């Protein structure tokens, strides 16, 4: 038995002497195969050697750069090459019920004193920078994890018993954070409050980077491992590392192999930082290596799986049991509401023939008569210079001009052409009659015999001017109402927008009523994810998350191409849950 132990020790010594200068896995071609070792319970642990190699690799890096051994929890990039859970991340514990006033330095000192050497500590905080009472601690060796579970679980800290669980892959911490709708930053930056990462336009507008990758990078949830496919079979891990080192600091490169140890033409590369992995996608996706185009994307383990996936979100807006809906009666198959049908009926003949003000919908402005004061404005032309009738100009300047410019665009409005003959006559009455100065040329043929009567009319017309002045403000208030009705009832591609009113009116009508305001959003939700979420309601022109001091305020706006899409979003998206938060969706009246 002693001889067997000696031979086993000799074999172990020989295996350690044959390790390469740069520690790598024993699966790389050219490296000698190491004999499996047995653990204390007799179970063979074939990966113990690779674990020790990786630890020695981290030890070497820590001498030159202290940040090299700062692990990024929950990114799963340490073990993404093989999908195994054994590696440096196995030495981590999740701690809850921490006093809210406790700092991460105090937790580190406590664990180092009671347990052993600590390599990483992180306390999670909410968007306001307040402690959530939980965090993670990572130890240098695995035996410290067992010791922490034995000695520190239920340890009384400032009157609160600590709850400690082993968390090798970060699942316990991830579930705790998902319940609160937050995410981690993966470094001590989260200890001073979490927030969205500001990315340069070169990343945000890069067509080679998928939107979900950008949003996860902004929120600090993205890992640092990429997956490379369609590699030439002669490409080894050294060549893979050499190539991708152009994009950043490569911590590990692996080639996927079959059971015979031959390359499968794919591999993974783990970088020091997540942004380097994103840069590698931008630089190398589609590029040729040995005449073969590489397919580069984020490794599946580096992208968090959230509860707002596209296939889940599509079914969440429909009533339970309903598989789908057909086309509605509105433009593009959108459902049309009863209120739209009623307004269309009131508007009368406002259709493809144009906006004729004499149509049944408006009742003919010229025929409104004394009720509104438009009666026969042409007949008042000769009285333009008398008394208060001159104030009739305020109706044109104050009411008609302001409301028309506000609701129909600021372009030149041809009254006689754009609004039919009724407004044409109104235009001649106002402009030709009222705008003139007092003088014989404008007074018309007034006989001397009626001068007394006409002077007496000054009082009457003065009072009439005051009435028209008050009517001016009424028309000013009526302007937005007409504009709001028109934008919902008139097809912007047909009708009067193709006429003399010009493009200003089309732009104006296209921008009102098509923006929504969304509240109670998760604080880690990005504008890209918000846009993607609401794209199923219609074409999204713009999406924005309201920010304050670089942090999300939990609300945002989405602007659609049409008002119908905005109304649809209010109907089917209001009340749904995103990351456990029930959102409130309504039309943005301030747009």
UniProtKB/Swiss-Prot annotation:
Residues 91-169, 224-301, 514-590 form the RRM domain. Monomer. InterPro entries: MYEF2_RRM1, MYEF2_RRM3, Nucleotide-bd_a/b_plait_sf, RBD_domain_sf, RRM_dom, RRT5_SRSF_SR. Residues 1-92 are annotated as: Disordered. Residues 22-36, 45-63, 74-87 have a biased composition (Basic and acidic residues). There is a cross-link at residue 44 (Glycyl lysine isopeptide (Lys-Gly) (interchain with G-Cter in SUMO2)). Keywords: DNA-binding, Isopeptide bond, Methylation, Nucleus, Phosphoprotein, Repeat, Repressor, RNA-binding, Transcription, Ubl conjugation. It is found in: Nucleus. The modification Omega-N-methylarginine is found at residues 397, 417. The modification Phosphoserine is found at residue 422. GO terms for biological process: negative regulation of transcription by RNA polymerase II. Pfam families: RRM_1. Transcriptional repressor of the myelin basic protein gene (MBP). Binds to the proximal MB1 element 5'-TTGTCC-3' of the MBP promoter. Its binding to MB1 and function are inhibited by PURA. Highly expressed in the brain. PANTHER family: RNA RECOGNITION MOTIF RRM DOMAIN CONTAINING PROTEIN. This is Myelin expression factor 2. Gene3D superfamilies: 3.30.70.330. GO terms for cellular component: nucleus. GO terms for molecular function: DNA-binding transcription repressor activity, RNA polymerase II-specific; RNA binding; RNA polymerase II cis-regulatory region sequence-specific DNA binding.
């Amino acid at each position: 038995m002693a001889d067997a132990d000696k031979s086993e020790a000799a074999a172990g010594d020989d295996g350690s002497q044959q390790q390469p200068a740069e520690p790598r896995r024993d699966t790389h071609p050219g490296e000698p195969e190491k004999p499996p070792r047995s653990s204390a319970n007799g179970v063979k642990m074939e990966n113990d050697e690779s674990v020790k190699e990786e630890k020695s690799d981290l030890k070497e890096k820590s001498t030159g750069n202290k940040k090299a051994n700062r692990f990024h929890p929950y990114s799963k990039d340490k073990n993404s090459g093989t999908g195994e859970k054994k590696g440096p991340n196995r030495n981590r514990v999740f701690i809850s019920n921490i006093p809210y006033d406790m700092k991460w330095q105090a937790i580190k000192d406590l664990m180092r004193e009671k347990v052993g050497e600590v390599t990483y500590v992180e306390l999670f905080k909410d968007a306001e920078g307040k402690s959530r009472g939980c965090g993670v601690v990572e130890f240098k060796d695995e035996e410290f994890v067992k010791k922490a579970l034995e000695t520190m679980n239920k340890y009384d800290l400032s009157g609160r018993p600590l709850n400690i669980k082993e968390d090798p892959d970060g699942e316990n911490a991830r579930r705790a954070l998902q319940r609160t709708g937050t995410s981690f930053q993966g470094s001590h930056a989260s200890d001073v409050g979490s927030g969205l990462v500001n990315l340069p336009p070169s990343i945000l507008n890069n067509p080679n980077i998928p939107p979900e990758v950008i949003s996860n990078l902004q929120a600090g949830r993205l890992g640092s491992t990429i997956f490379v496919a369609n590699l030439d079979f002669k490409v080894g891990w050294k060549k893979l590392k050499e190539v991708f080192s152009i994009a950043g600091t490569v911590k590990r490169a692996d080639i996927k192999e079959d059971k015979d140890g031959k390359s499968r033409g794919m591999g993974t590369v783990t970088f020091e930082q997540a942004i380097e992995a994103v840069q590698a996608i931008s630089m190398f996706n589609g590029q040729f290596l040995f005449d073969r185009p590489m397919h580069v994307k984020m490794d599946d383990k580096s992208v968090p799986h959230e509860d707002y996936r596209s296939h889940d979100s599509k079914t969440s807006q429909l009533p339970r049991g309903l598989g789908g809906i057909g086309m509605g009666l509105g433009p593009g198959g959108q459902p049309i509401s009863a209120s739209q049908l009623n307004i269309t009926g009131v508007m009368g003949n406002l259709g493809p023939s144009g906006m004729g003000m004499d149509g049944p919908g408006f009742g003919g402005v010229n025929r409104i008569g004394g009720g509104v004061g438009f009666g026969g404005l042409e007949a008042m032309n000769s009285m333009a210079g008398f008394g208060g009738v001159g104030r009739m100009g305020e109706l044109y300047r104050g009411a008609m001009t302001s409301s028309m410019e506000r609701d129909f665009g600021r372009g030149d409005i041809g009254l006689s052409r754009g609004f039919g003959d009724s407004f044409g006559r109104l235009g001649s009455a106002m402009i030709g009659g009222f705008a003139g100065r007092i003088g014989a040329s404008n007074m018309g043929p007034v006989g001397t015999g009626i001068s007394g009567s006409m002077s007496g009319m000054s009082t009457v017309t003065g009072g009439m001017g005051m009435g028209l002045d008050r009517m001016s403000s009424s028309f000013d208030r009526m302007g937005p109402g007409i504009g709001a009705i028109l934008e919902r009832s008139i097809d912007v591609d047909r009708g009067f927008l193709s006429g003399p009113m010009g493009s200003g009116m089309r732009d104006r009508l296209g921008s009102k009523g098509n923006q929504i305001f969304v509240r109670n959003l998760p604080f880690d939700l990005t504008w890209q994810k918000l846009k993607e979420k609401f794209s199923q309601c219609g074409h999204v022109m713009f999406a924005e998350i309201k920010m304050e001091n670089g942090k999300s305020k939990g609300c945002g706006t989405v602007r659609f191409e049409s008002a119908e899409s905005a109304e649809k979003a209010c109907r089917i998206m209001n009340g749904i849950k995103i990351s456990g938060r029930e959102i409130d969706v309504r039309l943005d009246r301030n747009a």
